[in-house]
């Protein structure tokens, strides 16, 4: 096609689609007895782009990463926790393979595999869920189980979780139905005692009951604005059977429950087998042996445990693992701060003894990887405050004494400052 303003007879030309004359548009492209303007070309491109967006979920499903690929991607961002990564990779792959095949295979209905993550604070539960969502390019939202109450009580309804997921994808129901929901602090909604209580437990067992249908799969009616304040609005129908739910919690004390079960029958008195200190299992080793009966004793109701068939346990991070977290992942904390300082034209160096000191401090605080950022932020706060007002600083060096609070980071100046100090 060629760009023409007039035909051979000098006649004024018009766009065959919108009817605008050649003087009202920038370009008029001619074909055999037909013309199209640049504005209509742009409009056609927009229409095509929208259609591509609509079919993109199907394209994504056909290119579902394998469990090995999922595991390798997790390795780039999450240090350690190898058993949990393997469990997650298989569970996530099977979930999206199930969606791709329409919940059935050769007439056999495929069950839903929601996931329960058990591990101490700062061990990487949330990071694993976030990283999976980024890899699969699906909507992701987080909810805090401690804020949830069953319907009719002051607090957040469980349906609001789906409303948050819809917000993340501009209320596109099809996208939301392929999303991932991470519910944190799930251990905090455990039943307050082993026996059913006479008084209503609206934030414990009541929330577990409210979450049952949502996690298993139901058609949730969600208003675009959320909550119960806009009853006149048309509700969106969301099929939660296609949403992957990942629940996580520290489950403090669960190791003792597991230990009691394992040691039952070992006997007491003269015939008992006395275990030495070296034979005692660590918390991580005990958690890896968790059984449904242990979770029931901890306070989760059997029906709720049944909706979370895939269980992955995470161990407490060691000092070496924390040092690796500081420097090895793609978005490692030290790399983030180095990128931040580079925006000021300054190089930032963390010495090895500084990384060890940061890890030791985090271990002492018992906050896992979550506490690393606050330690680094505290050590660099004054420097980040002063640096934009300073000239000729080329490099900032952080050593062990900086982390201990005994000295400020070392500032290395460039040539102009060196000359000035020499004079």
Curated annotation (Swiss-Prot):
**Positions annotated to bind Zn(2+):** 15, 18, 37, 40
**One Gene Ontology molecular-function label:** ATP-dependent protein folding chaperone
GO annotation, cellular component aspect: HslUV protease complex
SUPFAM superfamilies per record: Glucocorticoid receptor-like (DNA-binding domain), P-loop containing nucleoside triphosphate hydrolases
Q: Where does ATP bind?
A: 120-127
Q: Name one Pfam family in it.
A: AAA_2
PANTHER family given in the database record: ATP-DEPENDENT CLP PROTEASE ATP-BINDING SUBUNIT CLPX-LIKE, MITOCHONDRIAL, ATP-DEPENDENT CLP PROTEASE ATP-BINDING SUBUNIT CLPX-LIKE, MITOCHONDRIAL-RELATED
The job of this chain, per UniProt, is described as: ATP-dependent specificity component of the Clp protease. It directs the protease to specific substrates. Can perform chaperone functions in the absence of ClpP.
Self-association or partners: how does it assemble? Component of the ClpX-ClpP complex. Forms a hexameric ring that, in the presence of ATP, binds to fourteen ClpP subunits assembled into a disk-like structure with a central cavity, resembling the structure of eukaryotic proteasomes.
Q: Member of which family?
A: Belongs to the ClpX chaperone family.
- What is the recorded name of this protein? ATP-dependent Clp protease ATP-binding subunit ClpX
